[in-house]
Amino acid sequence: MAGAKEIRSKIASIKSTQKITSAMEKVAVSKMRRAQLRMAASRPYAERIRQVIGHLANANPEYRHPFMIERPVKRAGYIVVSSDRGLCGGLNTNLFKALVKDMNENREQGVEIDLCVIGSKGATFFRIFGGNVVAAISHLGEEPSINDLIGSVKVMLDAYLDGRIDRLSVVSNKFINTMTQKPTVEQLVPLVATPDQDLKHHWDYLYEPDAKELLDGLMVRYVESQVYQAVVENNAAEQAARMIAMKNATDNAGDLIKELQLIYNKARQAAITQEISEIVGGAAAV
C-alpha cells in the first residue's frame, strides 16, 4: 500500500491547492467588479475632454498645438501598461508580443524607441529583453491615482515637446468582456483626428482665459486621462484574466483529483484482492 499512501498524500496536496485557487478566483471576481466601476467612471471624462479640445481647436483654427502637428518619425515613444503580479494567464505575454511586433516594424523603418514602463512585469521583461527605458513606475495598487502617473507621463510629453521623440503611443490591454482581453497599441500624440458627431452641431462659446491657453492646458490633461484610463482598464483586464486562470486551475485540480481517486481505488482493490488470494492460498495449503 506504499503506492496508495503516496496517492492519498498527493490528493490531499491537490485539494489544498484547489482551495487556494478557488479563493483566488472569488477575490479576482470582486476586484474585477470594482475595477469595472472605476473604468466606467473615468471613461466619460476622457471622452468629454476630447470633445472640448475639438471645440477649442475649431474656435482657434490659426493656432495648432504641438500635439496636433504630424512630423517625420525618427524616434517613437511607448507608454507600456503591464501588471504588477502574475497568475493572470497570458495577459502580459500577449501584450509584450503585440508591443515587440510594433517595435520591430518601427525599427525596420529606422525608428529608434524610448519606453516608459508601468508595472513590475513590464520592468522585468525589458530588463531581460533590453530597451531604452527612460521612465518606470510600479506598485500602483488596486486603486491607482492619476497623480501617481503624472511624473512618468510628463517625462514622455516633455520628450515630445523637445523633439526627442516624434510619436507617443500607449500599449495596454483592453477589457472587452470577462472572457476577452485585447492587447492594443494606440497613438496618443500627435492627436489622431477622429470624426466627432458632436462638432457638427456646435455653438460659439466665450472662453476665459482665451482658447489657446485652455487648449495648452487641456492637451496635457487629455493625455494624462488617456494613460489613466489605460491603467484602470488594464487592471480590470488583469482581474478578469486572473479569474479565468484560477477557475481553470480549480477545474483542472478537480479533474486531477478524480483521476487520482480512481487510481487509488484500483490500487486499494488490487491490494485487497492480493490479501484475499494469500489467505485463500494459505487455507488451501493447510
Curated annotation (Swiss-Prot):
It is a peripheral membrane protein. One of its GO terms (cellular component) is proton-transporting ATP synthase complex. Keywords: ATP synthesis, Cell inner membrane, Cell membrane, CF(1), Hydrogen ion transport, Ion transport, Membrane, Transport. GO terms for biological process: proton motive force-driven plasma membrane ATP synthesis. InterPro entries: ATP_synth_F1_ATPase_gsu, ATP_synth_F1_gsu, ATP_synth_F1_gsu_CS. The keyword RNA-binding does not apply. It is found in: Cell inner membrane. The keyword Membrane applies. Its main location: membrane. One of its GO terms (molecular function) is ATP binding. Pfam families: ATP-synt. It comes from the Bacteria. Belongs to the ATPase gamma chain family. Produces ATP from ADP in the presence of a proton gradient across the membrane. The gamma chain is believed to be important in regulating ATPase activity and the flow of protons through the CF(0) complex. F-type ATPases have 2 components, CF(1) - the catalytic core - and CF(0) - the membrane proton channel. CF(1) has five subunits: alpha(3), beta(3), gamma(1), delta(1), epsilon(1). CF(0) has three main subunits: a, b and c. This is ATP synthase gamma chain. The gene is atpG.
